[in-house]
Design a protein with these regions (language model features):
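Membrane translocator/pore-forming domains, dominated by Gram-negative outer-membrane beta-barrels
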Residues: 47-91, 95, 99, 133-460
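Short loop/turn segments immediately following beta-strands, especially the blade-tip
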Residues: 37-46
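Short loop/turn segments immediately following the C-termini of beta-strands
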Residues: 28
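Residue-level detector of Asp-centered blade-edge/turn motifs that repeat once per structural unit
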Residues: 16-19
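Beta-rich catalytic cores
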Residues: 10
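A short beta-strand motif characteristic of beta-propeller blades
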Residues: 1-5
Length: 460
């Protein structure tokens, strides 16, 4: 700290530069007016640098990254779990025809995965090409909108959470009634921290492999394994100054569940147990925008381990050319994830700090209600509303709408991903008439970029 008593007899005013790295002291000694200038090691740090761990918005911003990483595992696995539950609710559906699906990525890691893991994973069926029941593909998609809030505490500000995502998947049934598939998720999380403008904007891309396997007549095991890539934009606003940061991350996650269905008169009761697990790594980053106040964050590892028990209830109604199937979900979850910590320092002075025991472990209740609509034409619909409520009062509301479509033998689909841009192509041949439809979407563009193209032609 600075002691100016030996240099100024009558201090009448103190001022700081805009970045807080310079302090000016006005001394009135008799008629001699003197202004002294002092260089500070960090912004506005006259005695000591401002301790970020004592600022509720700073603490909340750090907690938000840990919470968002754990929520990402839930938001990525829920659509796949919904799909596996849908498959078992409708396991009597026969495959209509064979389809051809291709996956292309410009990312070298994902492209390598698609060329090595996908063929091995999706061809391990020992099924005959002449057996349509065991060789047809099904495409599905699910869009999710989620809103939530985590209240303030004695050390942390409140957080308002908005999440939107789309999941695209493909699966097929094997000879032993085993369903295997893959899913791609594109998501965006926006979290507002406190009341001064601090925020986290997180964009994610996830690739999931999943399998649902029978263990008898009515007992099934579901498991999935996946990888997500994370890019975050962070704003830390104190009201008078604001800093910005960019952070990348990777996440490995998995889930295993066991379900046993009890049926009577088209009414199904399915108790289940489930374990979710995962590890997230966030890279180090340095804030910009306020010299003297910018913080430098070390890399961080976040563990996730959640167990849950619950049940599903559904009942089938057979209507003309369609089936209507309403259902209800209930789950009780115990979060036993280990605590994590974040180390950081002022980039100007190097003063170091650590936020320990970042632990969002809690107990929560998950409820959901929705319905399936299954038509003979090949188009099927699933809608679902869910709510996650913790014992501490935080919550998440989700609305889900998903589609499934199976087309004719002469139909082909192609899905390609180029950085954040996605392209879906559909081609169909009817006698000598060919129909090509291509749609592209950049999910994370500031100004959404999208297009759809239709081509109809004949070959003779």
């Amino acid at each position: 700290g600075y002691d100016v008593s030996g240099e100024a007899d009558q201090v009448s005013g103190i001022a700081f530069s805009s970045d807080g790295l310079k302090m000016f002291v006005l001394d009135f000694k008799t008629n001699n007016k003197t202004v002294s200038e002092y260089n500070l090691s960090c912004g506005f740090g006259v005695i000591n640098c401002i301790d970020p761990t004592a600022n509720k918005d700073d603490v909340a911003s750090i907690e938000t990254q840990s919470e968002s990483a754990k929520k990402l595992i839930q938001h990525t696995t829920y659509p796949v779990i919904n799909r596996m539950q849908w498959l078992r609710r409708n396991n009597s559906r026969g495959n209509l025809t064979n389809q051809n699906i291709k996956f292309q990525f410009n990312n070298e890691i994902l492209n390598s995965l698609s060329k090595t893991l996908l063929p091995v994973y999706l061809s391990n069926y020992n099924s005959s090409n002449t057996d349509n029941e065991n060789s047809s593909w099904s495409l599905w998609s699910e869009g999710t909108i989620s809103v939530g809030r985590i209240g303030d505490t004695s050390v942390s500000s409140s957080k308002d959470i908005n999440t939107s995502a789309i999941t695209l998947g493909a699966d097929k049934r094997g000879k032993d009634n085993i369903m295997r598939g893959i899913a791609l998720r594109f998501g965006s999380d926006d979290v507002d921290v406190g009341d001064l403008g601090s925020a986290l904007n997180m964009s994610t891309f996830g690739l999931t492999f999943y399998e649902t396997k029978p263990k008898g007549e009515e007992r099934f095991t579901d498991h999935l394994l996946g990888l997500s890539f994370i890019n975050s934009d962070l704003i830390n606003n104190s009201g008078s100054t604001s800093t910005n940061g960019k952070r990348s991350g990777e996440q490995i996650y998995g889930s295993f569940s066991l379900r046993d269905t009890l049926s009577k008169n088209n009414l199904n009761f399915t108790p289940k147990i489930k374990i979710d697990y995962g590890v997230t790594h966030f890279a180090e980053y340095t804030e910009t925008g306020a010299t003297g106040l910018n913080l430098k964050f070390k890399d961080q590892y976040i563990g996730n381990f959640i167990t849950s028990v619950g049940a599903n209830i559904d009942k089938k109604f057979d209507l003309k050319n369609k089936t209507f199937l309403p259902y209800f979900d209930f789950n009780y979850s115990a979060d036993m994830s280990p605590s994590t910590k974040q180390k950081f320092s002022y980039s100007s002075s190097g003063d170091k700090y650590t936020l320990d025991n970042i632990n969002n472990a809690t107990h929560s209740v998950h409820t959901g209600i929705g319905f399936d609509l299954i038509t003979d034409s090949g188009f099927n619909l699933m809608t679902k509303y869910t709510r996650d409520q913790t014992t501490e009062g935080s919550y998440n509301d989700n609305f889900v709408i998903a589609g499934d479509y199976r087309a004719s033998y002469n139909s082909t689909y192609a899905l390609s991903v180029h950085e954040t841009s996605t392209e879906i192509a559909y081609k169909s041949k009817h006698n000598n008439l060919n129909v090509d439809v291509t749609s592209n979407l950049d999910f994370f563009a500031d100004d959404p970029e999208y297009g759809i193209y239709l081509k109809v032609y004949s070959l003779k």
